[in-house]
Every structure is written in C-alpha cells, then in structure tokens.
Curated annotation (Swiss-Prot):
Protein name: Keratin, type I cytoskeletal 26
Keyword presence, Ribosomal protein: no
Spans annotated as Coil 1A: 83-118
Region: Linker 12, residue numbers: 233-255
Span list, region Coil 1B: 141-232
MF-aspect GO terms: structural molecule activity
Record-stated family: Belongs to the intermediate filament family.
Amino acid sequence: MSFRLSGGSRRICSRTGSGRLSGGGTGFVAGNVCVGSGARSSFSCTLEGISSGGSFCNSGGGLGSGACAGFLGNEHSLLSGNEKVTMQNLNDRLASYLDHVHALEEANADLEQKIKGWYEKCEPGSSREHDHDYSRYFSVIEDLKRQIISATICNASIVLQNDNARLTADDFRLKYENELALHHSVEADTSGLRRVLDELTLCTTDLEIQCETLSEELTYLKKSHEEEMEVLQYTAGGNVNVEMNATPGVDLTVLLNNMRAEYEDLAEQNRKDAEAWFNERSATLQQQISDHEGAATAARNELTELKRNLQTLEIELQSLMAVKHSYECSLAETEGNYCNQLQQIQDQIGVMEEQLQQIRTETEGQKLEYEQLLDVKIFLEKEIDIYCNLLDGEERKSKSTCYKSKGYRPVNSGNQAKDSTEETIVKTVVEELDQIGNLLSLRVHSVEEKSSKISNITVEQRVPSKAP
C-alpha cells in the first residue's frame, strides 16, 4: 500500500454556497477551503478546526470577492477518531459564514440604493436629463478667462517694457563706454600735443634769446659807429691841412656796411635755419600726429568691435549659465526622483526579503510537518505490510495444510513444504529536495526478497538526496 501526495494538500471548493469535502489515506484532512460569491464588498473570516497551523488570504472588490483558508493537520489530528465530528463542525461554520456573507451583500445593496436615492434627491434639478447643469458657472468661467487673458497681456507688456528698458540701458552703457574710450584717446592726444607744444616753446625761447643777443650786438655796433662818426666829424670841422705821404686810411663806412651786411646775412641764415628746423619738426610732428590719429582710430574701431563681441559673449554666457542652471535643476530633480525610486526599490527588496525569509520559515515548518506526516505514513505502511505478511503467511499455511490433506504438494522453488517461506519487501524512499529545502519529487523503489524466516519484515530506507 502506498500514498501519493500532490503538493501536500487536498482541495475543498465552493462556488455557489455548497461545500464539497474530500479526504484520503487514514482519515486525515489537509487542504484549502475556497469560497467565491458575487458581492461588491470584501470580507475575511477565520475557520478553526483541528489544524495546528494554517494560512488565510482574502481578496475582493468589483463584482466578486472571495476568501480562502488553509488547514494542515498534524500527527495528533491524523490519529484522532473525531474526523466526522470535525468535518460536520466545519460544514456548519461554513454554512453560517455563507449566510453571514449573503446578509452582508443584501445590507450592502440596500445601502447602495439608499445612497443613490439620496444623491438623486439632493442633486440640483430633479430631471435625469439635467442632473449636471453647470450653465450658471459659464459666465463666471468666461469672466475668469477674460481676467486671465488681460493679466497675461499686462504681464507680457510689462515683460516687453522691461526688455526694452534693459536694451536701452545696454545701448546707453555701450555709448558711454564708447565716449569714455574716445575721451581717453583725446586726452592722450592732448597730452602728446602738450609735450610737442612745450618743445616748440623751448625752441622759440632759444631763438628769441639769440635774436635779443644779436639785437644788442647790433645796437652796440650802431652806437660805436655813431661815436666814431661824431669824432670824425669834430675832427674834420677844423682848418688844419696836413699833408702826409702815407698809406690811405680805411673807409669806416664801407667797413661798417660790410659788417652790417655780414650780420644781416648771418641773421637771415639763422632765421632760415630756424624756420627750416621748425618746419621740419612741425612736419615730423604732424606726420606723427596723423599716424597716431590713424592708429588711434583703428584702435578705437577695434575696441568698439571688441566691446560688441564682449557684449555678445556676455549675453551668450548668461544664456549658457541659465541653461546650465536649468540642467543642474533638472539633474538634481532627476537624482531626487531616482533616489526616491531607489529607496522605494530598496524598501520593496527589504519587504521581499522579509517575505522570502517568512516563506523559508514557513517552508521549513511545512517540511517538518511533511516529514512527520511521511514518518506517520511510513509507520502505517509498515504496519499494513506486517499485517499483509501475517495474512499471507496464514493463507499459505492453510493452503499447505489443504494440499497435505488432499495428497498434493505445492511448488516452492526447491524448498521443502515444511519450510514456510516469507517474502521480504525492501522499499527505498528517495526524496529530491532543492537548495532551500522544498520537496521536488518522491520515488519509492520496492525489491522483493524471499527468506525462510517469518521474522524478516519490511525494511525501508530513507535516502535524502539534494537536487542539483
């Protein structure tokens, strides 16, 4: 005799309120109870019986709800003799539970009808065609829309004025910077011209000093010439006639005229040299001024262009900074979202780990209960095999007695009739378990052996093996 357990459970199902109970083996019950109905509510219950451990789950909502309760018996309940009383108690409780469910469904339907009637009574407008009349809110909605549009237009105009003011301020700032640069360049040119003017003033002062010196010399020469002329005229006024045979004297007038001509030529030459030097220096300075003015104009234009480029780059930098700030905000928000999601996932992982640990604990408990049940089953099989062997031995004895009385002899594979033969059945139970201890499969191997002793009874071995 052998037992076969599929999933370690038997099922008791009910769909319309009636229960169907099934059991097997030696009279013990281990299984699940499921109840389904079409109620619009969810409920839960607990069925108590002979089970020492079990589980209960509840699901409901929409147009259906259900409750299931699992019962698993232990060794004491298997060996007890009150199975019929227990099953009757369970059936009574299930019937009372179904009656309670139907009563709750009726009460729920009554409450739904009352709520629906109350809503129909309290709705503005009694007719069903105009249950939701929102026409009185249309004017308020239109007014609010107009206010929103006007506020949006006002806000846009303010933003436009702000932009115009900012652009005007930028233009004035650019003009101010250009004027300031022009002012600095003019001041630099003025400083250079002042230095040139100082140099020209020094040159003019030197020339004036030289001119004054020459004028003083000319005045002194004129005065000396007049004195000599007076002396000569005074001496020529007498009537002294002196005749001397001597060399003729020097004509002072010619000499003075020659000296005057020489000084005038020298003064003219100095004037021409000074004028030429002044013209040369003035031309050089004018050339330098024109060159510097061209360079200043080019530098000014280049500075203006650089300022425009600088303003463009500043605007671009501000836009890039705004984009960077928006990206940073988006990155921070994304990091926050992913951190929240990661925290949720970690919480879910923690919950799943707790559930897995709980499932492992329940599995260990179920494994222990299953081993207890398997031990009970094996013990019962042993007793049944012993009884069967005893019965077979008695039948063989009776048959051999009958054969002797009739004069026949039974065929016994070479043994004498007086030696009672006994078959020894060796059963090997192989369990395949996974890594967490769950039972995958159960195999029973039977080997028949014959012996001459009746004391050899059934021997069973349990060889647990780990599944890969």
